[in-house]
Amino acid sequence: MYAVIVTGGKQHKVTEGEFLKVEKLDVATGEAIDFDRVLLVANGEDVKIGLPVVEGAKVTAEVVSHGRHDKVRIIKFRRRKHHMKRQGHRQWFTEIKITGIQA
């Protein structure tokens, strides 16, 4: 059984027991969270597609940890001017474990 959920402006295909890194959520570590925006639920041959969401479906997850991704380096360069600007960015994430899918 799997589902497609929306969180942080992105769509994720999830299965029960899977660990997933999503955009930072303001939930404490160890707490449970419900995702109500479920676009698709599939259980073998039984597939439910939402318009735009599946009514009554929800995915429950547990927050495992918070952290930051690896650094992404940005370089802005102007030709012939001896100008180079370097910048780095580390995006925050929340790691979750999918504990249940209900359709």
UniProtKB/Swiss-Prot annotation:
PROSITE patterns: RIBOSOMAL_L21 (PS01169)
UniProt keyword annotations, A-Z: Ribonucleoprotein, Ribosomal protein, RNA-binding, rRNA-binding
Domain of life of the native organism: Bacteria
GO molecular function: rRNA binding; structural constituent of ribosome
A cellular-component GO term for this protein: ribonucleoprotein complex
Biological process, per Gene Ontology: translation
Family according to the record: Belongs to the bacterial ribosomal protein bL21 family.
Subunit-level organization: Part of the 50S ribosomal subunit. Contacts protein L20.
HAMAP family: Ribosomal_bL21
Function: This protein binds to 23S rRNA in the presence of protein L20.
Protein name per Swiss-Prot or TrEMBL: Large ribosomal subunit protein bL21
Organism listed in the record: Pseudomonas aeruginosa (strain ATCC 15692 / DSM 22644 / CIP 104116 / JCM 14847 / LMG 12228 / 1C / PRS 101 / PAO1)
Name of the gene: rplU
